[in-house]
């Protein structure tokens, strides 16, 4: 049982029992597990300008905030900062639509329930039959392609296995899920705005109000040059407007309020959070599928997996041969809310399945102080060719204190279901899987250049080839040793990726006969790198055992991604800090005397972590820099053997430093807790 800050309450229960036959041999056993967690999650309230915001927080017309949705520049018509527009619309500049803060769109109360049960039966003295089931349900906020509110999600997994320990096994399991009442928080903000008035109308209403009501006031400011004077001085106009910055800000607030509330035709006023109108619109949107104008997920996907393995051992020759294989089938079912299993003309949904088949074999041979291992694996996804992955490793242990290892390996990563079949609108862009390729996308930087000049020759086009499996070759060196009281383990790797899987960002742009963009749609397309991508890294960790009760530990890692072709449009989404380390001290079974008091059988641990800042690449809304941060975790514990109990009191992030761990997520602070563990 565990309780702590943020209304944390967690409890877990496990019970197991085994039975023997009349001869005293193990015959069957069963176990059940249950855990429940409840807490108030940290709220994502980052109102800093997003990495894509073209203006800062002090812009009088607003800005694009990280955790405010709907204030993005989606449709254009909101930029009046060029010299001609600045003269016709003085003080208007760039403005952003009134958005919705995430805290008004999601429930931060986290709840999670997990149940599992297993039954083991010995068919004979060596062969065991296992049946197991797992169930999970919960509600939380999750960050994936967008910020999602997961409500009443369900997970089921059932496994059947027959095995002979250290000899062979046949295993089959099925995983099923149900999205429950989950929805996309970001897309919900867009739907709320659409229910009020389209973005294009909102932008036109804003500029029209400014032109008709605010412009005369601006030109009436003392010192402001006349709009139609032949020698119009833009620098003078800018200085007058800057001197009246507070007034300009008030005019923008006035304009925003007017545009949010004044409507025509089928338009509606802004849905203000906390009102019955907002609740009604919100509930309607989050209870309908995207195809019905809502943002609710439908996901009743399934995964079926079968695997078998056989081991052949020749003890005299110190040789082991392993052969095995697996078959896996994915059956996504999202009714078009996540994948491209969309509604067809005959009112049925497109059915998607995806199957994978793999075989592997390996030899392990011990020769004195050496142990060699050679393996080969072949994988086949129904949408891609066969891929072969050989590997070899050698371990040299001249003594118990020194172990050297070297390996040359290869691996394959088949494109995921999302890489193949995703079709998901996140507002700023449509995220696409990519089995067929994509032609004539416009690079985002060239489109921005084009907008400055309306010169179509500045547009740069590129194609995206169909997605294919990612292959990696890795060489690794390692060493571990025990020097008296000091244990050290260090390793270095270098990897070469061919067809590294990431994504490309591009625009599908239609240009009118007047040279103006008539439509613009942003896409994030799953893609492979066009050149070799390399990664390398080094890690070292160790423990120093001062005595049997006290130990020090440390760990450092360095990881680096290298994209050699700078013209490649790939976005790798590596999302890994280049440097990080932690150091700590721990004690166990301690005896401490304080005056006449004696505290026995207690322990503690304190750990310091440092993580270097890094670029977090997700969806267009959630790509930005995570600043460097450090944390201290601490805990004390006490064993009470007479009660069969262990008590822990501790805190993660003890100093309560509010840090971002993902871009777009909340600032995570301290979580202090007390935990009781009872073994009956």
Predicted regions and their residues:
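Transmembrane beta-strands of outer-membrane beta-barrel pores
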Residues: 1-7, 19, 36-40, 135-139, ...
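Face-selective signature of the C-terminal outer-membrane beta-barrel domain
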Residues: 158-343, 349-384, 489
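Membrane-embedded beta-barrel scaffold of Gram-negative outer-membrane proteins
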Residues: 405, 436-522
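Gram-negative outer-membrane beta-barrel transporters
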Residues: 366-369, 492-615
């Amino acid at each position: 049982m565990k309780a702590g800050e943020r209304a944390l309450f967690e409890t877990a229960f496990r019970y197991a029992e085994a039975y023997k036959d009349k001869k005293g041999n193990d015959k069957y056993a069963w176990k059940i597990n249950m855990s429940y967690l409840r807490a108030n999650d940290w709220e994502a309230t980052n109102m800093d300008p997003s990495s894509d915001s073209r203006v800062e927080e002090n812009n009088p017309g607003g800005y694009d905030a990280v955790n405010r949705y709907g204030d993005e520049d989606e449709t254009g018509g909101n930029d009046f900062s060029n010299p001609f527009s600045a003269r016709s619309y003085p003080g208007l500049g760039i403005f952003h639509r009134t958005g919705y803060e995430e805290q008004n769109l999601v429930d931060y109360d986290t709840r999670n329930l997990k149940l599992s049960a297993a039954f083991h039966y010995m068919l004979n003295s060596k062969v065991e039959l296992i049946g197991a089931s797992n169930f999970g349900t919960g509600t939380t906020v999750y960050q994936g392609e967008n910020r999602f509110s997961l409500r009443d999600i369900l997970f089921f997994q059932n496994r059947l296995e027959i095995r002979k320990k250290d000899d062979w096994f046949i295993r089959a399991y099925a995983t099923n899920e149900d999205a429950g009442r989950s929805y996309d928080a970001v897309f919900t903000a867009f739907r709320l705005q659409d229910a009020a008035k389209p973005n294009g109308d909102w932008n036109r209403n804003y500029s029209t109000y400014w032109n008709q009501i605010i412009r005369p006031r601006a030109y009436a400011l003392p010192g402001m040059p006349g709009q139609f004077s032949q020698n119009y001085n833009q620098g003078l106009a800018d200085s007058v407007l800057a001197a009246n910055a507070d007034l300009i800000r008030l005019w923008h607030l006035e304009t925003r309020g007017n545009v949010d509330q004044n409507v025509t035709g089928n338009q509606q006023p802004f849905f203000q959070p906390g009102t019955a109108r907002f609740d009604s619109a919100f509930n309607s949107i989050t209870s309908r599928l995207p195809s019905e104008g809502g943002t609710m997920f439908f996901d009743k996907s399934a995964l079926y997996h079968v695997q078998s393995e056989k081991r052949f051992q020749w003890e005299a020759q110190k040789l082991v041969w392993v052969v095995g294989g697996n078959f896996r089938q994915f059956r996504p079912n999202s009714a078009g809310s996540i994948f491209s299993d969309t509604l067809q003309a005959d009112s049925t949904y497109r059915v998607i399945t995806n199957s994978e088949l793999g075989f592997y074999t390996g030899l392990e041979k011990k020769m004195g102080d050496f142990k060699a291992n050679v393996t080969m694996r072949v994988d086949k996804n129904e949408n891609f060719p066969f891929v072969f992955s050989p590997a070899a490793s050698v371990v040299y242990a001249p003594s118990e204190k020194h172990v050297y290892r070297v390996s040359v390996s290869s691996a394959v990563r088949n494109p995921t279901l999302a890489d193949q079949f995703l079709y998901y609108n996140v507002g700023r862009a449509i995220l696409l899987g990519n089995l067929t390729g994509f032609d004539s996308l416009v690079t985002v930087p060239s489109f921005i250049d084009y907008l400055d000049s309306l010169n179509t020759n500045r547009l740069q086009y590129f194609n995206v080839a169909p997605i294919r499996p990612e292959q990696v070759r890795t060489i690794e060196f390692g060493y571990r040793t025990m020097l008296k009281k000091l244990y050290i383990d260090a390793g270095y790797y270098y990897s070469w990726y061919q067809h590294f899987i990431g994504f490309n960002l591009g625009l599908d742009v239609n240009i009118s006969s007047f040279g103006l963009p008539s439509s613009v749609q942003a896409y994030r397309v799953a893609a492979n790198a066009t050149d070799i991508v390399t990664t390398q890294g080094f890690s070292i960790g160790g423990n120093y055992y001062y005595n049997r009760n006290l130990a020090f530990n440390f760990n450092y890692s360095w990881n680096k991604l290298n994209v050699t072709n700078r013209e490649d449009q790939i976005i790798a989404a590596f999302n890994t800090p280049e440097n990080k380390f932690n150091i700590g001290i721990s004690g166990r079974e301690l005896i401490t005397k304080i005056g006449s008091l004696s505290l026995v059988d207690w322990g503690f641990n304190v750990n310091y972590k440092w993580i270097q800042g890094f670029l977090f690449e997700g969806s267009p809304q959630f790509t930005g820099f995570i600043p460097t941060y450090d944390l201290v975790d601490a805990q004390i514990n006490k064993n009470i053997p007479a009660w069969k109990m262990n008590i822990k009191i501790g805190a993660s992030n003890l100093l309560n430093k509010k840090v971002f761990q993902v871009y777009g997520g909340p600032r995570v602070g301290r979580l202090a807790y007390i935990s009781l563990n009872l073994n009956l």
